[in-house]
Amino acid sequence: MDPTLISLGALALAGAAATVSGCAEDLESDVGSQSNPNSQVQLGPQMGNIHRYFNKAISGEPVSYGLYVAVAGSVAWALINAGLN
């Protein structure tokens, strides 16, 4: 198999993992905010409501982390192939 194809597959996998971990972090912080009475943002009334997940999805934060990984990996791959390692 072509090494470039393997590199791009690994990059896509890292981007997907960053997206999933960003979504999981958002869900975990929502639950933590619900149980903390001293939290700056009280999310208790929003727990379990679809609009909360929709707002997270359109904010794009988890997807932006995946994009950061993809851009950083592409730049690193280009520099390594240019002999700048």
Curated annotation (Swiss-Prot):
Subcellular location: Cell membrane
GO annotation, biological process: methanogenesis, from carbon dioxide; methylation; one-carbon metabolic process
EC number: 7.2.1.4
Membrane topology type: Multi-pass membrane protein
Enzyme class label: translocase
Transmembrane segments: 4-24, 63-83
Pfam families: MtrE (PF04206)
Pathway where this protein functions: One-carbon metabolism; methanogenesis from CO(2); methyl-coenzyme M from 5,10-methylene-5,6,7,8-tetrahydromethanopterin: step 2/2
Record's catalysed reaction(s): 5-methyl-5,6,7,8-tetrahydromethanopterin + coenzyme M + 2 Na(+)(in) = 5,6,7,8-tetrahydromethanopterin + methyl-coenzyme M + 2 Na(+)(out)
Family: Belongs to the MtrE family.
Quaternary structure annotation from Swiss-Prot or TrEMBL: The complex is composed of 8 subunits; MtrA, MtrB, MtrC, MtrD, MtrE, MtrF, MtrG and MtrH.
Reported function: Part of a complex that catalyzes the formation of methyl-coenzyme M and tetrahydromethanopterin from coenzyme M and methyl-tetrahydromethanopterin. This is an energy-conserving, sodium-ion translocating step.
This protein's name: Tetrahydromethanopterin S-methyltransferase subunit E
Species per Swiss-Prot/TrEMBL record: Methanococcus vannielii
